[in-house]
């Protein structure tokens, strides 16, 4: 048997492959200028602690990505066009949503009065078919005057294997957003949690009560203006046994 590598003949040439996959992640849409909504000073909200690590002197702008420009790339344009066509065919007077594409993910920013009909269209229209809502997340931007509270909905199309987000912003003085439980019943407890933690009131929810904190708990613990130290609670009736009666762990 010869060890001469010249005896090895190359196989047939395969089909040409594109240099880069043409997906939304690899072909990002051009975006506008970022939008600053606040500034962060130091770490974790702690003040006046005599910090010597240097982190207490950090100053960082809090910015949100700007609006995306057409073409968005990949299937993003198909979803945006399908949503516009479906709402128009349904006779809905829906304001054109702001579209933000960041880190390969698309978000539609809606007015609160448009949320429920848009959710209905996204679920039912055959071009869209976002059958599943994974929940709603709350975000608090205390320096974004008139838009302090944001509700972010995460939708999945199992038919088309696509994920999008819807986002609605409301003022702290009027924190009302329509509930989408009539469209996505599994959002029930998620809306209760967002109400409990952020104080967003979901109008039309079947039973909007606290879900983590006691019913009489003051405030909403995940807001930026909530005290870092929490609320002092006094426990009564506790006893500490003498050392010779304590449990041994040896």
Curated annotation (Swiss-Prot):
Q: What is its main location?
A: membrane
- What keywords sit in the KW lines? Cell membrane, Membrane, NAD, Quinone, Translocase, Transport
Its recorded reaction(s) are: a quinone + NADH + 5 H(+)(in) = a quinol + NAD(+) + 4 H(+)(out)
EC numbers on record? 7.1.1.-
Topology within the bilayer: Peripheral membrane protein
GO: which molecular function terms?
A: NADH dehydrogenase (ubiquinone) activity; NADH:ubiquinone reductase (non-electrogenic) activity; quinone binding
Q: Where is the signal peptide?
A: none
One GO CC term of this entry?
Answer: plasma membrane
Q: Specify whether Calcium is a keyword of the entry.
A: no
Question: What is the role of this chain?
Answer: NDH-1 shuttles electrons from NADH, via FMN and iron-sulfur (Fe-S) centers, to quinones in the respiratory chain. The immediate electron acceptor for the enzyme in this species is believed to be a menaquinone. Couples the redox reaction to proton translocation (for every two electrons transferred, four hydrogen ions are translocated across the cytoplasmic membrane), and thus conserves the redox energy in a proton gradient.
Tell me which HAMAP family the record gives: NDH1_NuoC
Specify the protein name. NADH-quinone oxidoreductase subunit C
Q: Which organism is it from?
A: Nocardioides sp. (strain ATCC BAA-499 / JS614)
């Amino acid at each position: 048997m010869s060890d001469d590598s010249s005896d090895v003949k190359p196989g047939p040439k395969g089909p040409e492959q594109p240099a880069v996959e043409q997906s939304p992640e690899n072909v990002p849409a051009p975006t506008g200028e970022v939008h600053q909504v606040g500034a962060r000073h130091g770490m974790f909200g702690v003040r006046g602690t005599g910090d010597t690590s240097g982190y207490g002197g950090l100053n960082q702008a809090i910015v949100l990505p700007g609006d995306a420009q057409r073409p968005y790339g990949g299937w993003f344009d198909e979803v945006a066009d399908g949503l516009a066509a479906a709402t128009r065919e349904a006779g809905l007077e829906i304001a054109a949503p702001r579209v933000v594409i960041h880190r390969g993910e698309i978000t539609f920013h809606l007015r609160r009065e448009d949320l429920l009909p848009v959710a209905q269209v996204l679920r039912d229209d055959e071009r869209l078919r976002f059958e599943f809502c994974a929940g709603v997340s709350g975000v608090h931007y205390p320096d974004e005057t008139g838009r302090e509270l944001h509700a972010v909905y995460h939708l999945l199309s199992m038919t088309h294997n696509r994920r999008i987000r819807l986002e609605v912003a409301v003022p702290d003085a009027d924190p009302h957003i329509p509930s989408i439980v009539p469209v996505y019943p599994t959002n029930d407890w998620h809306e209760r949690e967002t109400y409990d933690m952020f104080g967003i009131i979901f109008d039309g929810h079947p039973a909007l009560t606290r879900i983590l904190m006691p019913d009489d708990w003051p405030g909403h613990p995940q807001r930026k203006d909530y005290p870092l130290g929490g609320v002092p609670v006094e426990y009564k009736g506790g006893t500490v046994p003498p050392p010779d009666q304590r449990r041994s762990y040896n």
